[in-house]
Amino acid sequence: EQAKNWFNLKHIGKSPSRFDFKKLSNISKLHIANTDNAALLHELIEYLNVVDQPSLSQNHLNGLLRSLDFTKSSVKNFPELIEKNSFILKDRPINIDPDVTEKIEEFPLKTLKILTPQLQNVKWDRSKLEELLNSVCEQVELKFRTVAPILRAALAGSSKTPSVFDMMTVLGREETIERLIEFEVKYNNEI
C-alpha cells in the first residue's frame, strides 16, 4: 500500500512523483529484509515462475528457507537474493569459477585432509564449526583468511558467498563433507 501511495500516477511529471529507481530499490530492500522467510520464499518462487526459471527442488527450497535469515538483509532484489543463495542452489559436482582456480594451486590441500574427518564429529552449529576451523588453521599454521577462499570455492564454487560458517550450517554435515571431499579429490589429481 505504501508503495502505491509513493508511486501513484496522480502527479506524474512533477518532480516529487517521478519514478525513482533508487527509491524503488530501497523499498525493495526493506521489503525483502522485513518479510517473513516463508512468505519471502513464496514470493521468490513466484518470481522464478515469471522469469521462466526452472522450479526448485524440495531440498533447494528447504536450504533457501534456512539461509534467508542471513542472506536477505543484504540484498536489494530477487536476482541478488538468488545470487547470494547460489551455494544452496548448486548440485554436485560444484563448478569452480575461473577467478578462483589460481588460488587453489597455491593452497596446501592437506588442510582439507585434516579438516574433513574432524567435521564428522563436531557439533553442527556455527560456533563449534568456527572453533574447529580456527583450530585446524593453527595446526597447519595458516590464517583463516587464507583458508576461507578455498572453503568458499569447495562449498560454493565462488568467492562471492555468505560466511563459510553460515554456508556449512545451511548445507549440513553430509553435504559439506561431500563437497569438500569432491573438491580435494579433483584438485589433488589436477595439481
Regions found by a protein language model. Give the residues of each.
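Charged substrate- and nucleic-acid-binding regions of tRNA-handling and nucleotidyl-transfer enzymes
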Residues: 123, 127-187
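Short helix-capping/linker segments at secondary-structure and domain boundaries
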Residues: 33-37, 79-80, 157-163
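Short, mixed-charge aromatic SLiMs
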Residues: 3-12, 51, 95-98, 138-141, ...
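A conserved active-site cap/scaffold subdomain adjacent to cofactor or substrate pockets
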Residues: 1-52
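Small-residue-rich helix-loop
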Residues: 37-142
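Non-catalytic, well-ordered alpha-helical scaffold segments
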Residues: 21-25, 65, 69, 145-149, ...
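Short, hydrophobic/amphipathic alpha-helical patches that form generic packing surfaces
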Residues: 26-30, 69-76, 149-153
